[in-house]
UniProtKB/Swiss-Prot annotation:
NCBIfam families according to UniProt: PRK07920.1
Reported effect, E200A: Loss of transferase activity
Gene this protein is translated from: patA
Annotated positions binding hexadecanoyl-CoA: H126, R164, S206, E229
Subunit: Monomer.
Disruption phenotype: Mutant exhibits severe growth defects and contains an increased amount of phosphatidylinositol mono- and dimannosides and a decreased amount of acylated phosphatidylinositol dimannosides compared with the wild-type parental strain.
EC id: 2.3.1.265
GO MF entries: acyltransferase activity
Origin species: Mycolicibacterium smegmatis (strain ATCC 700084 / mc(2)155)
Protein name: Phosphatidylinositol mannoside acyltransferase
Biological processes per GO annotation: glycolipid biosynthetic process; phosphatidylinositol metabolic process; phospholipid biosynthetic process
Keyword Transferase among record annotations: yes
Length: 304
C-alpha cells in the first residue's frame, strides 16, 4: 500500500522522521540534544549492540565478534549518535566560527595541489563527522563537489541534498542526473577544484576488489580513475572525534603514475585501514562491509 499513491508507507515514515529530526533537534538546547542522542546510543548498545557493527569491528580489532569489547561497541554507537546529532544541528550552527575553530592537520598537501593547478580528489571513509570537514573546506576554500546516493523515496533524497547544499556543497546524484557524475567530477578537477568522495564501500560489480583488514571487500573505482584521467592529486583524508571537538587530517598524495586502478585503490584501502584502526569507535559502518557478510544471492551477483 502506498501513501498518496506515490511513496511506500515505510519510505514516507522515514522521510518524515528525518524532517522532524532536522526541525526538532535544531531547536533543542545542546545539553538536551546530547542527552537524547546519548540515551539512544545506550539503548542501541543493549544486548551486545547491532550484530553487523560487531562483525565489522571484529575485523578492525582482530578478534572474533563475540570478543569485541562491549566498551568499543558503546563508544562506536555514541560516536554514531553524535554524528547524527551534529548533522541535525549543523545547518543552524555558525559556519564561519566553525571554519575558524577547526584545524585540519597537513592541509598544505591540498593547498599545494591547488596552487599547482591540478585539482584534488579527497577520498574519505565514513568516520567522525565528514560533513563538518566539508563545512571547514567551504569556509576556508569555497564550494566543492561531492556525490550522493539516490535514496528512496525521492523526497528523502532531496532532503539530504538540500541539507548538504545548505552547507555550501555542490551535490551530484549518483544516478538519474542530467549527466554522469564522473563526467562532471572530471570537469571540476580540470577546472582546478576539489572534490570529496566517500570511498570505502562499493559492494557492486563496478567496485574494485581489495584486501581490507585481511579480508576481501570492494571499494569505489572512482577516486583512482578520476585522478588517472585528469592528473588530479588523490589524497586520503580521515576525520575523527577529538573530545568535544573534531580531528581531521589530509594524508600525502597517493602515487597514481602506474595507471593501475586496482593497485591505487588498494593503497587507499591500506591508508583507510591504518586510520580506522587508530580510531575504531569513530568508523560509522553498520552495514555489511566485506563480501563474506553478503547473502548468497548478492555474492552470486558479484560473481564471487
Amino acid at each position: 500500500m502506498t501513501l498518496s499513491g506515490r511513496i511506500p508507507l515505510g519510505g514516507q515514515v522515514t522521510d518524515l522522521g528525518y524532517a522532524a529530526g532536522w526541525r526538532l533537534v535544531r531547536a533543542m538546547p545542546e545539553a538536551m540534544a546530547q542527552g537524547v542522542f546519548g540515551a539512544g546510543a545506550r539503548y542501541a548498545a543493549r544486548n551486545g549492540g547491532p550484530e553487523q557493527l560487531r562483525r565489522n569491528l571484529a575485523r578492525v580489532v582482530g578478534k572474533p565478534p563475540a570478543d569485541v569489547p562491549d566498551d568499543l561497541i558503546r563508544a562506536s554507537l555514541a560516536s554514531y549518535a553524535r554524528y547524527w546529532r551534529e548533522a541535525f544541528r549543523l545547518p543552524a550552527m555558525d559556519h564561519g566560527r566553525l571554519g575558524e575553530q577547526l584545524d585540519v592537520i597537513d592541509i598544505d598537501h591540498l593547498w599545494s595541489a591547488l596552487d599547482a593547478g591540478r585539482g584534488a580528489v579527497l577520498a574519505l571513509p565514513h568516520s567522525g563527522n565528514w560533513d563538518m570537514a566539508g563545512v571547514w573546506l567551504v569556509q576556508n576554500y569555497g564550494p566543492f563537489t561531492t556525490v550522493a546516493e539516490r535514496l528512496k523515496p525521492e523526497s528523502l533524497y532531496r532532503r539530504f541534498v538540500e541539507y548538504r547544499e545548505s552547507l555550501g556543497f555542490e551535490v551530484l546524484p549518483l544516478t538519474g542526473g542530467e549527466r554522469p557524475p564522473f563526467e562532471v567530477l572530471a570537469e571540476r578537477l580540470t577546472d582546478n577544484r576539489p572534490i570529496c568522495l566517500m570511498a570505502e564501500r562499493d559492494l557492486t560489480r563496478s567496485g574494485v576488489q581489495v584486501d581490507f583488514f585481511g579480508e576481501a571487500t570492494r571499494m569505489p573505482a572512482g577516486p583512482a580513475k578520476l585522478a588517472i584521467e585528469t592528473g588530479a592529486a588523490l589524497f586520503p583524508v580521515h576525520c575523527w572525534f577529538e573530545g568535544d571537538g573534531w580531528g581531521m587530517r589530509v594524508y600525502p598524495e597517493l602515487d597514481t603514475s602506474s595507471g593501475d586502478v586496482t593497485a591505487i585503490t588498494q593503497a587507499l584501502a591500506d591508508r583507510f585501514a591504518a586510520n580506522i584502526a587508530t580510531y575504531p569507535a569513530d568508523w560509522h559502518m553498520l552495514q555489511p562491509q566485506w563480501i563474506a557478510d553478503l547473502s548468497d544471492e548478492r555474492r552470486a551477483r558479484l560473481g564471487t
